[in-house]
Amino acid sequence: MTQAKAIARTVRIAPRKVRLVVDLIRGKQVGEAVAILRHTPKAASPVVEKVLKSAVANAEHNYDLDINSLVVSEVFVDEGPTLKRFRPRAQGRASAINKRTSHITLVVSEKKEG
């Protein structure tokens, strides 16, 4: 089975927030997945939609796959490098703020007949 992949690296959204969105489209057909992402009011939705469109374009251009038969076969989010920042607090102290990043990997493949 031929599959096409797209990866977005170091996206400035925390992985646990992106996972909420990618869990909605796992196993869905591409058209349905795009519709779900368009109607999901989360900051990660447009980013995941862009990765999905990239994977579909890769499938069409690199592997000559039929875009109507594609499904989101695999999608996962890994943690990227963390940006460490400090927030001033009372009494001259400072608290660490971790600004987390994500690596989003999305794989589309042709749906099996039957």
From Swiss-Prot:
GO biological process, one term: translation
GO molecular function: rRNA binding; structural constituent of ribosome
Organism, scientific name: Lysinibacillus sphaericus (strain C3-41)
Record carries keyword Ribosomal protein: yes
Gene3D superfamilies: Ribosomal protein L22/L17 (3.90.470.10)
Name under which the protein is recorded: Large ribosomal subunit protein uL22
Self-association state and partner proteins as the record states: Part of the 50S ribosomal subunit.
Keywords: Ribonucleoprotein, Ribosomal protein, RNA-binding, rRNA-binding
GO cellular component annotations of the record: cytosolic large ribosomal subunit
Function: This protein binds specifically to 23S rRNA; its binding is stimulated by other ribosomal proteins, e.g. L4, L17, and L20. It is important during the early stages of 50S assembly. It makes multiple contacts with different domains of the 23S rRNA in the assembled 50S subunit and ribosome.
Gene: rplV
Family listed: Belongs to the universal ribosomal protein uL22 family.
